[in-house]
Amino acid sequence: MLSVKQELLAALADELEKVSPGAGSRAAFESPKVAAHGDLACTAAMQLAKPLKQNPRALGEQLQAALEATPAFQKWVQAIEIAGPGFLNIRLKPAAKQQVVREVLAQGAQYGYQPARGEKVLVEFVSANPTGPLHVGHGRQAAIGDAISHLYATQGWSVHREFYYNDAGVQIDTLTKSTQLRAKGFKPGDDCWPTDSENPLAKNFYNGDYIQDIADAFLAKATVQADDRAFTANGDVEDYENIRQFAVAYLRNEQDKDLQAFNLQFDQYYLESSLYANGHVDATVQRLVANGKTYEQDGALWLKSTDYGDDKDRVMRKQDGTYTYFVPDVAYHIQKFQRGFTKVVNIQGTDHHGTIARVRAGLQAADVGIPQGYPDYVLHTMVRVVRNGEEVKISKRAGSYVTLRDLIEWTSKDAVRFFLLSRKPDTEYTFDVDLAVAQNNDNPVYYVQYAHARICSVLRGWREDYDVAALRDVDLSPLEGPQAQALMLLLAKYPEMLTAAAAGNAPHDVTFYLRDLAAAYHSYYDAERILVDDEAVKQARLALVAATAQVLHNGLAVLGVSAPARM
């Protein structure tokens, strides 16, 4: 079933096509900047005037007359007014605005979803090194990545969430050495803390309490489950490889617990080490060499990345024969593409900005059919945490930073998700712990959730065992007050808001929308009593608030936030 707006857009596209072949693709409505000007605005006449060499006002009048004669506009539109150089301001009939209530109640949790498009998108996020607990920055990335995944699902994409484990770098050696030293009884600050060439200065080791936890578990010959495999320690403090594998497995298990507390489930964990074990890294380098995209200089192998827009050529293989970190990244993204993911979105910190050009250059130089601009990137800044008016910088558990688990324990999963999504990813953000637990309108997640719970309370006041299905076909004509009209217009904007948020990888837009919707509901609730004696009026108002609760629920679900029925 087409929505009112879709019907009107289809009619507009048909009339534009008659004006100029191909112009139907320009069919679009905007929201008027001034509410008094109408419900929808159309600027097509001004866009077409120049290429058609016509007066925009005259073209607007022509389009106005044509639209007024269409069945869709006659059914749903009260008036079309022309303004300025050719703006078309459209006023909807009350029935057109009321129709969204029926759409929401009929579609339920699927309201806002688009049909399946038969394409796959891979969203890679968190991808933390298995060297310590997840910090608040990882939490921001987890919230952003999961919400973007939900947004793509609403647009008909088949979504694959992936976590890339960097388990093959220098940091893993640092983790292993740190654990080995603790297992031998050393600790930071000891006079005997090693400082020779094999064991760098203590500042280069991980000092958090979690390292001692790993060492204790290793000495106890514990077994830990990480993803799809279990690993058992042998307790031998001289068995470096056993310590390495156990420490990585232990921290992967700990990170999994953090993600579970965040209600986040990945479809796949992809190990960097597997790219080497399966020969993908060597194969990628060989392909780049065979394509003539590399050269030898100063004992190193270089990629001609400046040929693809990078600011300088990049070293691929160092003098010691090891690869630089972007080489496995190129191999990994070739694997993503060859697994059938036509679209890939990477969520990363802004400190990774410098890798974008070189990875894309490597993918183009490999010449395997990957389109330019692949993959997409969403970069986010770190998070500053404030508690009791003071910045919190250190966690005893981690030793040097506030962990995601700390933040969840201090507040809640819902608060952490909503707060970390409430600003553009590349905007600096201060997480106020005290605000996140406040039960007042200054707390945005409380404000939105309270609107949902308040509606559920009203519905229980109607019937304790209420079923909104009974409201789908009620007469909605009593919904004519200004607050009701504003609320219905906002409900109708939900699908297009999702589409725009997905296109822009902008989950913060969902938080803005939900706050506006909650405000519109509270305004309506204060203006019109819902459980009135007049049965027809009561039924119509119940249908409207039930539809509002459904959209609040749907939007919160996109963010991974619950919609409580009681608070």
UniProtKB/Swiss-Prot annotation:
It is an enzyme of class 6 (ligase). Keywords: Aminoacyl-tRNA synthetase, ATP-binding, Cytoplasm, Ligase, Nucleotide-binding, Protein biosynthesis. GO terms for biological process: arginyl-tRNA aminoacylation. Its main location: cytoplasm. It catalyses: tRNA(Arg) + L-arginine + ATP = L-arginyl-tRNA(Arg) + AMP + diphosphate. It is found in: Cytoplasm. It holds the Pfam family tRNA-synt_1d. GO terms for molecular function: arginine-tRNA ligase activity; ATP binding. It comes from Acidovorax ebreus (strain TPSY). This is Arginine--tRNA ligase.
